Amino acid sequence: MALTVKVITPDRVVWKKTVEEIILPSSTGQLGILMNHAPLLTALDIGVMRARMVNTWVPLVLLGGFAQIDNNLVTIIVSDAEEVKAIDEEEANKLLAASLANMEKAQSNREKIESMQNLRRARARMQAILSLK
């Protein structure tokens, strides 16, 4: 028996797999989930979800949301998600550099918040890419 993980965005099911273990980027830190985990509802932060399937870890970038764990079913509802195979490393590096530059230029509170969110997303994308190397 294993965990069934379903990642859902507002417009589609991004990922549905059976896994042995999952590590979620919760708002309070990394959260590991194994089979027969107690029922749980948790907020998710921008970050990399890692799923272990047959001794291979598969990363997926999550952009904030919620996860519900119940009866070996993990339902993840997020604003957006990206599979690593869809991320171009060169473009991700450029976006990270641009996000850092925008963070330094930000002056209003709104600009600072938006640039921080963009920076966190860019870092998560790079972290996911680097986890495969």
UniProtKB/Swiss-Prot annotation:
<keyword id="KW-0793">Thylakoid</keyword>
<keyword id="KW-0139">CF(1)</keyword>
<keyword id="KW-0150">Chloroplast</keyword>
<protein>
    <recommendedName>
        <fullName>ATP synthase epsilon chain, chloroplastic</fullName>
    </recommendedName>
</protein>
<dbReference type="GO" id="GO:0009535">
    <property type="term" value="C:chloroplast thylakoid membrane"/>
</dbReference>
<comment type="similarity">
    <text>Belongs to the ATPase epsilon chain family.</text>
</comment>
<keyword id="KW-0472">Membrane</keyword>
<comment type="function">
    <text>Produces ATP from ADP in the presence of a proton gradient across the membrane.</text>
</comment>
<keyword id="KW-0066">ATP synthesis</keyword>
<keyword id="KW-0934">Plastid</keyword>
<dbReference type="GO" id="GO:0046933">
    <property type="term" value="F:proton-transporting ATP synthase activity, rotational mechanism"/>
</dbReference>
<dbReference type="GO" id="GO:0005524">
    <property type="term" value="F:ATP binding"/>
</dbReference>
<dbReference type="InterPro" id="IPR020546">
    <property type="entry name" value="ATP_synth_F1_dsu/esu_N"/>
</dbReference>
<dbReference type="InterPro" id="IPR001469">
    <property type="entry name" value="ATP_synth_F1_dsu/esu"/>
</dbReference>
<keyword id="KW-0406">Ion transport</keyword>
<comment type="subunit">
    <text>F-type ATPases have 2 components, CF(1) - the catalytic core - and CF(0) - the membrane proton channel. CF(1) has five subunits: alpha(3), beta(3), gamma(1), delta(1), epsilon(1). CF(0) has three main subunits: a, b and c.</text>
</comment>
<dbReference type="GO" id="GO:0045259">
    <property type="term" value="C:proton-transporting ATP synthase complex"/>
</dbReference>
<keyword id="KW-0813">Transport</keyword>
<dbReference type="Pfam" id="PF02823">
    <property type="entry name" value="ATP-synt_DE_N"/>
</dbReference>
<keyword id="KW-0375">Hydrogen ion transport</keyword>
<dbReference type="InterPro" id="IPR036771">
    <property type="entry name" value="ATPsynth_dsu/esu_N"/>
</dbReference>
